[in-house]
């Protein structure tokens, strides 16, 4: 795990009152940890809701562990966590960053949520030689993240705990999940907030526009974060994003 992990809270979190009227599931990104969505959870808890942020399968372990996880396992884990919240709360919402955003959209397409917010969600990968990925990963299964995480604030980037290697098998699983989500966007009906950093070098801003246009939600809003990269909750626009997400969840969840 790279980053100054010893100085930050990167484990799963459960914030706010257990008996709050509504609960929000907060889902992190690929190779990341709950740390990167914790600021959103803290704002949601301050708004009077419960916020639960689990670690997705293969995370908080090793890149090798992550490489063996299939996209259906991520979705099943997210679905189970949401069902647990639904069992004890009248209303539930879901918030996701990147991979977590894809999972949030998949859950919303199942009609399982009352509100949704997604951040930096990649509908497609824009990687050179992408069709060769299955062959490349057989000889080079991991790619080192030499530049660290896609965060524009240097101090925040240094603190950010994540794997320092990306399993190419996990990239293939991400692509499979992207295809599933693209096919189901029109089935998303819950009020949605789509947020995206304009300096995001991982997920193209066009993906945010496509999500906003393709979902079936009657209430939809887009929020552009001008000074942030991909991991917006811990980047320069983090406080602005957290306030918007908490307001959205408190209004609709």
Predicted ranges, named:
Residues 209, 213-231:
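Catalytic histidine neighborhood in serine/cysteine hydrolases
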Residues 62-88:
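Catalytic nucleophile-loop/oxyanion-hole region of alpha/beta-hydrolase
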Residues 45-63:
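Conserved alpha/beta-hydrolase
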Residues 96-100, 104:
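Gly/Ala-rich beta-loop-alpha elbow adjacent to hydrolase catalytic centers
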Residues 226-253:
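Catalytic active-site module of serine/aspartate enzymes centered on a nucleophile-bearing elbow/loop
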Residues 188, 194-196, 200:
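Short beta-strand/loop motif that positions the catalytic acidic residue
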Residues 117-127:
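Active-site nucleophile loop of the alpha/beta-hydrolase fold
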Residues 201-207:
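Conserved alpha/beta-hydrolase "acid-adjacent" motif
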């Amino acid at each position: 795990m790279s980053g100054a992990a010893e100085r930050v809270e990167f484990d799963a979190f459960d914030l706010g009152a257990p008996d709050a009227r509504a609960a929000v599931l907060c889902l992190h990104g690929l190779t990341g940890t709950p740390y990167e969505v914790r600021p959103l959870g803290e704002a949601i808890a301050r708004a009077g809701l419960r916020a639960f942020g689990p670690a997705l399968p293969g995370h908080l372990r090793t890149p090798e562990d992550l490489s063996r996880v299939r996209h259906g396992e991520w979705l099943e884990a997210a679905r189970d966590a949401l069902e647990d919240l639904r069992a004890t709360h009248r209303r539930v919402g879901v918030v996701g960053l990147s991979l977590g955003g894809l999972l949030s959209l998949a859950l919303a397409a199942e009609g399982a949520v009352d509100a949704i917010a997604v951040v930096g969600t990649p509908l497609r990968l824009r990687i050179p030689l992408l069709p060769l990925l299955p062959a490349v990963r057989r000889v080079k299964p991991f790619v080192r993240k030499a530049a660290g995480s896609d965060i524009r604030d240097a101090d925040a980037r240094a603190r950010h705990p994540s794997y320092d290697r990306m399993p190419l098998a996990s990239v293939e699983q991400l692509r499979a999940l992207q295809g599933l989500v693209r096919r189901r966007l029109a089935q998303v009906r819950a009020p949605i907030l789509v947020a995206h950093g304009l300096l995001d070098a991982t997920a193209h801003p066009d993906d945010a526009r496509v999500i906003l246009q393709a979902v079936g939600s009657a209430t939809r809003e887009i929020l552009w974060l001008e000074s942030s990269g991909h991991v917006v909750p811990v980047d320069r626009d983090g406080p602005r994003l957290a306030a918007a997400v908490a307001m959205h969840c408190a209004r609709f969840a």
